[in-house]
Amino acid sequence: MTSSSPSPQASMLLYWHENQYDDRNFQIHGRTLFFALALFSVVLFFALLTLYIHRNCLPRDSINLHASSPDRLTRCRSGGLDPAEIRSLPVVLCRRERAEEEEEKECCICLGGFEEGEKMKVLPPCSHCYHCECVDRWLKTESSCPLCRVSIRVDSSS
């Protein structure tokens, strides 16, 4: 005699406890919620820190993005140049030539024009010119060119 009904073990395997996985029983307890929020906060903090570093410490132009220059990370250092370094920058007198008179030159810090015979400082890495007083004040707090942001720091190892 063969029975067509499943054995008791087989029926136990197929038996489903619906109320065991019901959504109404799903609860987030205090400790789990605390750890989930702490993990989310840590991930958010590191994401914002990475974004800040990429925006403020890495070069903005794609040309220098992969270049291995010692000036790449000097922009991250806070503070300006030493007074001796500021005094060592070259000073030139402004001379108007006829070709330059059509194109008005001005100091991008104070937006004032350069007058004939006025003293200007030239920043060596980029050759940008500024009024001596303007760029001296700038370089006391910053170590980069005000216009192109290239580092002005002199490498002490050379």
From Swiss-Prot:
Keywords: Membrane, Metal-binding, Transferase, Transmembrane, Transmembrane helix, Ubl conjugation pathway, Zinc, Zinc-finger. It comes from the Eukaryota. GO terms for biological process: protein ubiquitination. PROSITE patterns: ZF_RING_2. GO terms for molecular function: transferase activity; zinc ion binding. Disulfide bonds: none annotated. CDD domains: RING-H2_RNF6-like. Its main location: membrane. SUPFAM superfamilies: RING/U-box. The keyword Membrane applies. One of its GO terms (cellular component) is membrane. The chain crosses the membrane at residues 33-53. Pathway: Protein modification; protein ubiquitination. The keyword Coiled coil does not apply. Signal peptide: none annotated. It is found in: Membrane. Its EC number is 2.3.2.27. It catalyses: S-ubiquitinyl-[E2 ubiquitin-conjugating enzyme]-L-cysteine + [acceptor protein]-L-lysine = [E2 ubiquitin-conjugating enzyme]-L-cysteine + N(6)-ubiquitinyl-[acceptor protein]-L-lysine. A zinc finger (RING-type) spans 107-149. It is a single-pass membrane protein. The RING-type zinc finger domain mediates binding to an E2 ubiquitin-conjugating enzyme. Belongs to the RING-type zinc finger family. ATL subfamily. This is RING-H2 finger protein ATL66. It comes from Arabidopsis thaliana.
